[in-house]
Amino acid sequence: RAGLLLNERLWAESTDTVKGRAEHTRVHTQRVEKRGNLVNLYEFTVFSDSLLLLGKCDCVEARRDDSGCRIPAVDFPVSLYPVEYKHGTLREEETYQIQLCAQAMCMEEMFHTVISEGALFFTSSHRRMTIPLSETLRTRTVTLAKELHLLRDTLSVPSAKYSAKCCRCSLQELCMPKIKMSAESYLLRLRQEAAGIIEEASE
């Protein structure tokens, strides 16, 4: 999917993408909401020189913390807590957790702070899932960031590996993940069929 989006510039709409965009409309308005010792920053831009990433957090909850860091738009020290909004109901998705971790790692680098956890908010069920930002998750995030840059640098599109997530992917018809055979294996099969090695069922 990343290869098709980044290198082939392909996109297709689906019911899920339309619903997801509609649900993000309120969140995806850059603004700051202050409520006492809590400040919510929406569409908050983050970056990392070490990860070579630039993006936006759906929401960052900045809570007053005398031992915390200083950030723009807030006049007191805070601890940071990223919240990523997702369409659908509460579920485990590694890619969502990696996205959240990348956002946290960007802010740690930007503001010289430590962020131990964040949350995924699922809009259909209105439930939060707390995500501990473990060393394992951080290592996986760094690895995928490097793979993403390599993908972009080589302008390659990896072969698709079919999984349950493909069923609801908007790019399924462009990606065709169920077609696993290469051109060579396809031609070999045709030659074998012509030679009578493979007998097709007549029923």
For every predicted segment, state its role:
Residues C59, Q103, C169:
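A residue-level signal for conserved active-site and pocket-lining positions in enzyme catalytic cores
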Residues Y96-E108:
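Short, charged, amphipathic alpha-helix that recurs within catalytic cores of restriction-modification
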